[in-house]
Amino acid sequence: MKKCKSFIAAATMSLAFTVSSAWAMPLPLGTDISDRFHGTVHRNDLIATDETYNLPQTNVISFEAGSYSGWHVHGAMTVIGIAGTGLYQERGKEAVLIRPGDVVNIPAGVPHFHGAAKDAPFQQFVIYDSTWKAPEGHAAHTGALTEEQYEEANENAAPSAMQNNDSEFLFGAGMTELTTPNFNSAVYLRKILGTPNAANSPEWVYVAFPAGTYNRWHSHKTGQVLIVTDGIGYHQIKGGALEVLHPGDVVFCPPN
């Protein structure tokens, strides 16, 4: 089989973004799904489960400030905070704040709600088992979240342990520098999702390319999937067209 050789480069990877307005989010919003929620919520489907990459379904969910779901259940899910401030609560447990870089693992079939804090929008990755079906006789509380429950969650949520991000990069807090012959200059890494996790996803590694940085031609035995979060970059399969990448783009490089 012909090897899939590719390279990745950055024209500039220093996207400046803010969350000062209702929808100033780093990744595209996608489809309006507000009819299923309280407030305004969008979903952007990024990765569908298939037999080549064997990855869980992966979407971006964006909540306007004060927007939230009802109590619900689904297959095992892992949430990664992208921007803003979010809330998550399993029924009967303490609510927790979610900030960029926070990871929440949600077991299959556990009733919970999630959404934005009342004074800030929130964007998150959701990685989950889209094939899960509740076992026969599975009992779980579902239904609307009351305003009182939402207010209590806002007032009493456990704080996030995530450190402040003073970097120009989206997941810049806690990055480590990497210098190898594979790159023309230093890149910066941070593991944002380890294994094992609820979604049964491979680990996620955030790689920041400073402006003008690129890697050599290379291939991956098991393939690679890239989700662009910052700035402008380039990707090319050897012999193929050069792709210009923007936040929200997904690149699939097949196994070699």
Predicted regions and their residues:
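Short beta-strand His + acidic residue motifs that chelate non-heme Fe in jelly-roll/DSBH
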Residues: S69-W71, Y88-Q89, P111-K118, N215-W217, ...
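Glycine- and acidic-residue-biased ligand/ion/polar-headgroup-sensing regions
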Residues: H74-G92, K221-G233, K238-G239
